[in-house]
């Protein structure tokens, strides 16, 4: 995150001047420059608690002459600084002009060593069995700022261990440092005040009201923000040490909110999904239901083969048969709002080459006003942008089905949808020539003449357009099953064969060169220019479309009427 | 919730006096505890509804403040101050003596259900140390020498016919 | 010449025939100050309090007029006055006498102060253990309301204020002003971080709030009665008025004595008022102001500056009873509850007693106090039960140093100061005791209980 250019003031930290936004929290301000003030309880998205006392630093302000109200200047030209008699917590300090901070004095070192020692005296020796190891703030700060040895020889406090706080969250009270981040999160972000501290003093214990659980759909965020291993994910428990995991940036496909995610994998297997920071979309949160979606990658229903007439075959044969069917005319298309923008673009090129009616299916979601919207697909707007859609899709495809029944349409190119669920009878399904591109088997793929394997969002690279008309990129985390290829390659090859144009564009960057040239709102863009926080496009062309989403965090449908290009 | 009409009336009169309902928390809990002898789970949830807060907010408070208890105690609540001024004048000896005389362990309820003996922290009567509170009354100058007589007095007052302690 | 009390606040405490009812209070001139003051401008009353130099009597000794001046008047939010009647500092019992024996003085002081700061509503937060006091105060308020001294349109002035008596439930930390505010809001008594939650700006319900001790509010009545400048003449410069000294511990006549600030010494308090130590014993140590203040060892000498600037040296008994004098001796007057310990006292056990208190009362919000207080308790308990090590002596002091000044509220200092003063000043006792314990552990045959000398304190 770079320093915003407006309203800067000068503060001095350890003898050096820094320009920071006025009023900004000191911890956040120093992070802009890569300077760390160690802290536990402070979190930029929650109210300030100030209880861990790890962020104690020395602060001072220039002293003013009582009579003249002028700043006193020392003989060497520097301002005379009145340092506070006690260290102050940085988390309640806002940057004001002239603020002086010292973080490298003996006093601050003593404070940090002291707090570290206090935090560790009742802490259990759980590192070998604690999931937090490797990303634990106690470990990190003990190494960086701790004394390195313990003086505690008394009996440690005993508290409940490994209790199920909720269906997805495990609580180990002995590890808890009582920072109250989880309590504040449930109170302030989710508005479900189910967590709290009972008892008093060093016996204070985090718990849920007896009989209730931490079961809201954002409970796993408490695991993310817990600085220690007190709150851990039951799904991830004991599965993998975090230092073996590689994170890759992705986008949650649960809904059109387009929550930014981090997907962690090792050797081709995904172990967990966590939120990725994006202050314009999801802050640093995501839903529990969104995290589960990675489990669809390893499913017995995965389509990891090419097939013609129910027989697995080489890609070449399947593509050839599909080309044949498409060239046969009377084609209808069913696109998917699960597809990436690049895939939808290639589909549009295909439609232009071999024309036919295009349908999408509306998948309504249950918006919760937070990070799940009323649209359960990540990229409906991509379909509008590419021109595949002019109006909102319905939940049925009756029009298209009638055309198939009447014989006006003989071949259907179906992406990711199940015709059986859309009212196609078994009989009709058998009679129709279907080319199916998708990730998981269903009745449609069972009956399809040609089956082309698709990849999940975790196995390919591309972009989605979310409810804010923000284009956001996702990157491949794990390779797809052996023998498969990203959808854009499959579609690209199909397009090449159908159009006779042999040149294909197998990478997102290359497709973007075409996208930018064809679609006016993307004029001047590039794949790189989207950045890692996404980029909003000019959506004035679709201002009249009554999209179904209501309010979410960082999204108000009423404000969309004046969307500017990013 | 089997609160007496008097208690319910008291709480209903009390709530509107406070600018915010949650403020009345301690007073409501005191009233319920005096009525029922302790604060049950039902009482906690009743209070939560009455004050329009989540039950966790009430539960947090009940476990924080030592005067609130979640289980019944003996008929007579004997509280011996253990902080410095009283300790300097023999509070620990007084407590031992009372435990012996009343047949009750420290922090426990006696087998006959008549007494509960606890240490408490300074009750702000240091000039007449050692002090002992029994139910809601303060008893001053209960020295180790006087402790056996004091215990006898408590026992005499606590005949089985006396209604259960309500404090 | 023996010093005598100057009973201003305590004029009628224990007076034969003085009863709690309004009629008695009025016979003795009660509510006359209110009658006159409520016709004056509130700002004038605040100025009187500023002129008086009155310092708060709750332990921190902050100038009351200055505190009132911090109130945020710009936001337009209602102002609240809270009387801190949560007297819980061990060794202190002065407010109890006022509440139980002269409640109307407190009521009048509360209404006067509420009027001066233009409070919308006043609370008296009384500790839960004072069952009787609660009833007495409620009764007194009802009497006052019936006579138009509390409630609507007081004495026809147009000013209205009600007083709600609110009971605590057994927490020392509710005596901390922001802890009290949280408790009054119906929550766990977690003190607030300052900045930004200064009560005068963001107090009760995030509105400007003043929290004053019981005795302070009573002192306000007398300030307004005689005028601020006259009040300032009582006592000494920098500490005007009287202090109510409650003495306890090893003295012949424990009790409460109202003494003009600076006009008597510790010696006077011990001998003239307290009747001296128990027969056959000598005083070894005193804690001047409630147990949170640093302990003084008899035999210590302090190099000080007298009010005229000249240097002097005081023994403990020489210290005048005013805040500046105690400050010069490295401790504090605090709540003026002096505890005397004689030569039979095991100083290690005394500290263990206090550490157990602070560990029990720590609210648990911030790391140093929460963990440090319990750790200190465990160490001193271990030493008292015979398991002491020589390194524990420095360890205790070191842990206390890690707590003081690093916490959200002053409970950190309260945890630390007894350790930081007891251990260095009585090091010989600690070393002797622990050495004996080590010896007993190494020679388990026939060794007597070397854990404790004197009375059991923990």
Regions found by a protein language model. Name each.
Chain A
Residues 53-251, 257-261, 269:
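Fe-S ferredoxin-like electron-transfer domains
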Residues 153, 161, 264-330, 372, ...:
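Cofactor-/ligand-binding subdomain signature composed of acidic, glycine-rich
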Residues 26-60:
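A basic, amphipathic helix-loop patch mediating RNA/tRNA/ribosome contacts
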Residues 512-566:
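Long, low-complexity segments enriched in small/aliphatic residues
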Residues 24-28, 340, 486:
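Short, structural beta-strand-to-alpha-helix junction motif
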Residues 344, 350-526, 530:
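Non-catalytic alpha/beta scaffold blocks inside enzyme catalytic domains
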Residues 332-343, 418-420:
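Gly/Ser/Thr-rich loops at beta-strand to alpha-helix junctions
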Residues 217-275, 416-418, 425-442, 477-492:
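Phosphate/diphosphate-binding loops
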């Amino acid at each position: 995150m770079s320093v915003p250019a407006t309203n800067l003031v000068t503060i001095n930290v350890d003898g050096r001047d820094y320009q920071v936004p006025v009023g900004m929290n000191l911890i956040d301000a120093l992070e802009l420059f890569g300077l760390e003030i160690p802290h536990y309880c402070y979190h930029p998205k929650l109210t300030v608690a100030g209880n861990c006392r790890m962020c104690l630093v020395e602060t001072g302000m220039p002293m003013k002459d009582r009579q003249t109200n002028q700043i006193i200047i020392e003989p060497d030209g520097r301002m005379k600084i009145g340092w506070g008699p006690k260290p102050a917590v940085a988390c309640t300090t806002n940057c004001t002009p002239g603020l002086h901070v010292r973080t490298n004095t003996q006093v601050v070192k003593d404070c940090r060593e002291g707090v570290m020692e206090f935090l560790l005296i009742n802490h259990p020796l759980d590192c070998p069995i604690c999931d937090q190891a490797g990303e634990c703030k106690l470990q990190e700060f003990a190494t960086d700022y701790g004394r390195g040895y313990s003086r505690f020889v008394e009996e440690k406090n005993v508290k409940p261990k490994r209790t199920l706080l909720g269906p997805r969250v495990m609580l180990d009270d002995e590890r808890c440092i009582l920072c109250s981040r989880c309590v504040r999160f449930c109170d302030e972000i989710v508005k479900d005040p189910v967590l709290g501290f009972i008892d008093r003093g060093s016996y204070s214990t985090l718990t849920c009201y007896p009989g209730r659980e931490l079961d809201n759909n954002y409970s796993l965020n408490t695991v993310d923000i817990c600085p220690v291993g007190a709150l851990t994910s039951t799904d991830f428990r004991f599965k993998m040490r975090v230092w073996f995991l590689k994170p890759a940036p992705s986008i949650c496909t649960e809904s059109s909110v387009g929550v930014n995610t981090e997907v962690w994998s090792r050797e081709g297997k995904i172990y967990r999904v966590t939120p990725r920071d994006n202050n314009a979309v999801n802050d640093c949160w995501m839903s529990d239901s969104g995290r589960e979606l990675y489990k669809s990658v390893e499913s017995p229903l995965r389509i990891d083969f090419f097939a013609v007439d129910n027989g697995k075959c080489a890609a070449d044969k399947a593509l050839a048969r599909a080309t044949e069917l498409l060239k046969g005319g009377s084609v209808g298309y069913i696109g998917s709002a699960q597809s990436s923008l690049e895939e939808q673009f290639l589909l549009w090129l295909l439609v232009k080459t071999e024309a036919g009616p295009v349908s999408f299916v509306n998948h309504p979601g249950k918006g919760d006003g937070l990070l799940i919207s009323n649209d359960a697909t990540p990229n409906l707007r991509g379909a509008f942008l590419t021109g595949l859609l002019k109006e909102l899709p319905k939940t049925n495809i009756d029009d298209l089905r009638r055309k198939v029944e009447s014989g006006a349409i003989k071949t259907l190119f179906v992406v990711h949808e199940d015709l059986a669920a859309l009212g196609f009878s078994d009989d009709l399904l058998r009679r129709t020539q279907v080319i199916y591109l998708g990730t998981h088997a269903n009745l449609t793929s069972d009956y399809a003449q040609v089956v082309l394997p698709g990849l999940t969002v975790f196995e390919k690279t591309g972009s989605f357009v979310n409810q804010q008309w923000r284009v956001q990129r996702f990157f491949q985390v794990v390779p797809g099953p052996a023998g498969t290829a990203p959808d854009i390659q499959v579609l690209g090859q199909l397009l090449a064969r159908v159009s006779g144009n042999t040149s294909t564009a197998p990478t997102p960057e290359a497709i973007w060169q075409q996208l930018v040239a064809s679609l006016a709102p993307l004029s001047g863009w590039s794949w790189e220019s989207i950045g890692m926080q996404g980029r909003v496009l000019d959506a004035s062309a679709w201002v009249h479309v009554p999209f179904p989403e209501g309010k979410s965090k960082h999204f108000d449908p009423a404000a969309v009427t004046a969307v500017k290009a990013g | 919730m089997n609160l007496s009409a008097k208690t319910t009336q008291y709480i209903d009169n009390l709530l509107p006096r406070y600018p915010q309902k949650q403020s009345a928390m301690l007073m409501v809990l005191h009233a319920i505890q005096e009525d029922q002898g302790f604060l049950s789970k039902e009482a906690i949830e009743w209070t939560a509804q009455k004050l329009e807060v989540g039950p966790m907010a009430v539960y947090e408070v009940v476990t924080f403040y030592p005067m609130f208890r979640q289980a019944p105690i003996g008929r007579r609540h004997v509280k011996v101050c253990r902080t410095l001024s009283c300790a300097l004048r023999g509070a620990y000896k007084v407590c031992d003596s009372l435990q012996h005389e009343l047949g009750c362990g420290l922090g426990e309820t006696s087998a006959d259900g008549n007494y509960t003996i606890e240490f408490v922290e300074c009750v702000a009567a240091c000039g007449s140390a050692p002090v002992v509170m029994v139910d809601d009354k303060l008893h001053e100058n209960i020295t180790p020498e006087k402790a056996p007589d004091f215990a006898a007095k408590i026992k005499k007052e606590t005949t089985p016919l006396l209604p259960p302690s309500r404090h | 010449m023996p010093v005598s009390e100057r009973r201003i606040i305590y004029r009628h405490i224990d007076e034969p025939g003085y009863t709690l009812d309004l009629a008695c209070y009025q016979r003795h001139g009660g509510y006359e100050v209110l009658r006159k003051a409520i016709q004056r401008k509130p700002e004038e009353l605040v100025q009187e309090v500023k002129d008086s130099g009155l310092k708060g009597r709750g332990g921190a000794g902050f100038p009351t007029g200055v505190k009132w001046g911090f109130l945020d008047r710009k936001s337009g939010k209602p102002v609240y006055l809270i009387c801190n009647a949560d007297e819980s500092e061990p060794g202190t019992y002065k407010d109890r006498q006022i509440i139980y024996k002269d409640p109307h003085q407190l009521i009048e002081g509360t209404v006067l102060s509420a009027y001066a700061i233009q409070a919308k509503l006043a609370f008296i937060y009384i500790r839960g253990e004072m069952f009787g006091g609660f009833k007495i105060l409620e009764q007194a308020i009802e009497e006052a309301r019936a006579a138009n001294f509390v409630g609507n349109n007081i004495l026809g002035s147009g000013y209205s204020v009600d007083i709600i008596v609110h009971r605590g439930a057994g927490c020392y930390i509710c005596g901390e002003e922001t802890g009290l505010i949280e408790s009054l809001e119906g929550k766990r008594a977690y003190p607030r971080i300052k900045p930004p939650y200064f009560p005068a700006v963001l107090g009760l319900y995030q509105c400007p709030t003043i929290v004053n001790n019981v005795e302070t509010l009573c002192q306000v009545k007398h300030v307004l009665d005689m005028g601020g400048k006259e009040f300032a003449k009582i006592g000494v410069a920098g500490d005007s008025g009287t202090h109510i000294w409650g003495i306890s511990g090893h003295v012949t006549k424990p009790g409460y004595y109202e003494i003009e600030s600076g006009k008597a010494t510790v010696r006077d308090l011990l001998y003239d008022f307290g009747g001296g130590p128990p027969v056959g014993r000598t005083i070894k140590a005193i804690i001047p102001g409630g147990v949170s203040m640093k302990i003084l060892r008899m035999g210590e000498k302090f190099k000080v500056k007298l009010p005229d600037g000249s240097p002097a040296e005081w023994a403990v008994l020489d210290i005048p009873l005013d805040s500046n004098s105690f400050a010069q001796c490295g401790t504090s007057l605090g709540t003026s509850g002096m505890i005397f310990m004689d030569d039979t006292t095991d100083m290690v056990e005394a500290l263990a007693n206090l550490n157990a208190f602070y560990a029990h009362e720590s609210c648990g919000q911030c790391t140093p106090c929460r963990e440090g207080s319990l750790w200190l308790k465990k160490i001193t308990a271990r030493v008292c039960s015979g398991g002491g090590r020589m390194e524990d002596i420095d360890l205790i002091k070191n842990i206390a140093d890690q707590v003081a000044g690093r916490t959200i509220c002053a409970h950190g200092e309260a945890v630390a100061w007894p350790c930081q003063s007891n251990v260095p000043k009585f090091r010989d006792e600690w070393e002797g005791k622990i050495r004996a314990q080590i010896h007993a552990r190494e020679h388990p045959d026939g060794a007597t209980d070397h854990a404790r000398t004197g009375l059991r304190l923990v």
